[in-house]
Curated annotation (Swiss-Prot):
One of its GO terms (cellular component) is ribosome. GO terms for biological process: translation. Belongs to the bacterial ribosomal protein bL34 family. This is Large ribosomal subunit protein bL34. Pfam families: Ribosomal_L34. Keywords: Ribonucleoprotein, Ribosomal protein. The keyword Methyltransferase does not apply. Coiled coil: none annotated. One of its GO terms (molecular function) is structural constituent of ribosome.
Length: 44
């Protein structure tokens, strides 16, 4: 059986990266929430 997690840095950046987050209203909300919380890392 194939495992569900097949790591790929390209897919990781495209799906969860900073620019992917900024592309949608909901994504910008996530970034702002993480900024307000004082996260060291905002996105993948």
């Amino acid at each position: 059986m194939k495992r569900t997690f097949q790591p790929s840095n390209l897919v990781r950046k495209r799906r969860h990266g900073f620019r992917a987050r900024m592309a949608t209203k909901a994504g910008r909300k996530i970034i702002n929430a993480r900024r307000a919380h004082g996260r060291k890392s905002l996105s993948a």
